[in-house]
UniProtKB/Swiss-Prot annotation:
Cofactor binding, note field: Binds 1 [4Fe-4S] cluster. The cluster is coordinated with 3 cysteines and an exchangeable S-adenosyl-L-methionine.
Compartments reported by the entry: Cytoplasm
Native organism: Xanthomonas axonopodis pv. citri (strain 306)
GO MF annotations in UniProt: 4 iron, 4 sulfur cluster binding; metal ion binding; rRNA (adenine(2503)-C2-)-methyltransferase activity; rRNA binding; tRNA (adenine(37)-C2)-methyltransferase activity; tRNA binding
Organism classification: Bacteria, Pseudomonadati, Pseudomonadota, Gammaproteobacteria, Lysobacterales
Name listed for the protein in its UniProt record: Dual-specificity RNA methyltransferase RlmN
UniProt GO BP: rRNA base methylation; tRNA methylation
Gene name as annotated: rlmN
Length: 401
């Protein structure tokens, strides 16, 4: 990957050629790193493997500390490469052991995301973001109130895992405190497909974090064509933000349903399972909101949908349900369902032989619970105003020219 470097003319008439931008090695999976070492550095493939382990196993970002690399190779790395990880703005522990990091992406202060670690009975799950903000406008999600800013790079996605694993003292293949990763943070992962898939490759690589495919879960609101593409490029676990089992209600909660209604979504999920013997189920997430989608009829609709899905895949428990009590945030019109309603909803599903779990709320005292992540993204009105000012400034400069 050769970058074109464009010279600039200075006021005194001299020409200055800027230095080529260095390659952030955190942006590369194993294949990309091998290619970079061969094409740019002229080095053997095993050298790329050594560096990958230094970065992801030992959390070393200074080439001079990579002691099994020769001096000449370290010099070439300094010239052509760097390892840039997200900056930790703050980290905040919860009373229940949950831990949240606010990570700065870039230098303008407007691009920050949140990453959450949830320990629970011998496992540790990291909730990772894929975008700064989100553009899908799900009406019950805090992130949606901030609008969409941009996609995260591969380095910014896997960098969240790096920051958390380093903080936790995680040692891949030995001392595992980070056992699962869920792409359920800020953003819609399938709208940042290439960067997310590349980052998940590092998560699952033995030279990276060594997680089994079933321990990496991608959660989507239902981009049908991208689910089909994911089926051909990755074997991770799939979760779907369903939240309603009829189109009219789901459209009011998840506007994407207008483009990809439930029938199309369920068909794509069935294709995903049929695409590999390694995949045996899809998790359907259902956030329970008081008086909105928590009534017995809603539970019966969901039970029917899960039975239809099992029949389509020809496998029992192909569809699993994860009930999520709604987590309130400032300005929302929704309320959490009561414990009685939650248990009654679950009982209807269990009686219909639908495998159903209720997700215990974690980290709500630090706004780290499901649906509460929003980072420090400029709100949409301010961002649109800034964009208009930028356009006006450009127009003034064009007129002056």
């Amino acid at each position: 990957m050769n970058e074109v470097v464009i010279p600039s003319v200075l006021q005194d008439g001299s020409v200055r050629t800027p230095e080529p931008r260095k390659q952030n090695l955190l942006d590369l999976d194993r294949e990309g790193l091998e290619r970079f070492f061969a094409d740019t550095l002229g080095e053997a493939r095993y050298r790329a493997h050594q560096v990958m382990k230094w970065i992801h196993h030992r959390y070393v970002t200074d080439f001079d500390q990579m002691t099994d690399l020769g001096k000449a190779l370290r010099a070439k790395l300094h010239q052509h490469a760097e390892v840039l990880v997200p900056n930790v703005v703050f980290d905040k522990p919860s009373a229940d052991g949950t831990h949240k990091w606010l990570l700065a992406m870039g230098t303008d202060g407007k691009n920050a995301i949140e990453t959450v670690y949830i320990p629970d009975k011998g496992r540790g799950t990291l909730c990772v973001s894929s975008q700064v903000g989100c553009g899908l406008n799900c009406s019950f999600c805090s992130t949606a109130t901030q609008g969409f800013n941009r996609n995260l790079t591969t380095a910014e996605i896997i960098g969240q895992v790096w920051v958390a694993a380093r903080h936790l003292g995680n040692v891949p293949h030995q001392q595992r405190r980070l056992t699962n990763v869920v792409m359920m943070g800020m953003g819609e992962p399938l709208m940042n497909f290439d960067n997310v898939v590349r980052a998940m490759s590092v998560m699952r690589d033995d030279l990276g974090y060594g997680l089994a495919s079933k321990r990496v879960t991608l959660s989507t609101s239902g981009l049908v064509p991208m689910i089909d593409r994911l089926s051909t490029e990755s074997d991770v676990s799939l979760a779907v933000s369903l939240h309603a089992a009829n189109d009219a209600l789901r459209e009011s909660l998840v506007p994407l349903n207008k483009k990809y209604p439930i029938a199309e979504l369920m068909e794509s999920c069935a294709r995903y399972l049929r695409g590999s013997k390694k995949r045996d189920s899809v998790t359907f997430e259902y956030t329970l909101m008081k008086g909105i989608n928590d009534q017995p009829e809603h539970a019966r609709q969901l039970a029917r949908l899960m039975r239809q899905f099992d029949n389509a895949v020809q496998s029992k428990d192909a569809g699993k349900v994860n009930l999520i009590p709604f987590n309130p945030f400032p300005g929302t019109r929704y309320e959490r369902s009561g414990e009685t309603e939650i248990r009654a909803f679950q009982k209807i599903l269990l009686d219909a032989q639908v495998l159903t779990m209720v997700r215990r709320t974690r980290g709500d005292d630090i706004d780290a619970a499901c649906g509460q992540l929003k980072g420090q993204v400029m709100d949409r009105t301010r961002r649109q105003a800034e964009f208009r000012r930028t356009l006006e400034g450009q127009a003034d400069r064009d007129a002056a020219a």
